[in-house]
Amino acid sequence: MEEAIRLAEVEGYRPKEGWYVLLAACFSELKDRKIIGPEYALEQQVGIYEILVNYYPKKQYFLQLGGTYQQMDRQDDYMLTLKAAYDKDLLNKEGEYLALAQMLLLKKNPYWAAQVIVAGQEKQITIKDEKTGDEEVVSVVKEKEKTLKLLADAWRMAQEIDKAIPVLEKAAKMSKDGDTYIL
């Protein structure tokens, strides 16, 4: 497979998407069978996924690249990969938005973190009920107490107190105890 990709590049055309996917799977299989070391396999997969996100920018490749970075303990690269997927509007799950927001907070980017959460709250997806077939349009990031607290914290850290207060008030109304009112 590596030879086919190399020959395609030498001849001046872009190798097929499936070739890269197959090559990444081969490295994963060789790693699992302990034929090659995990570090080498992960390095090879990173190179392949970096090509895939550039030539064929699909969500699955961004997530696979990010996951590989995580396995290599390259958290900054993982965050940047998630951010790139976000910038391309490829994220469509609450956990993806919240993971990116939390990583941005860890890297002291609270304003961006808040923007990511708000974007997730504003993004609408259609959910289909398997039993009834009814469709419902919902926000990707739900307005739950925990999420609202995270958003309020991000706004506060970004010195956007006027944006944090209404969010905290909403979270406090959802709270089962009075702790949120103290914040």
Where are the regions a protein language model picked out?
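Alpha-solenoid helical repeat scaffolds
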Residues: 1-183
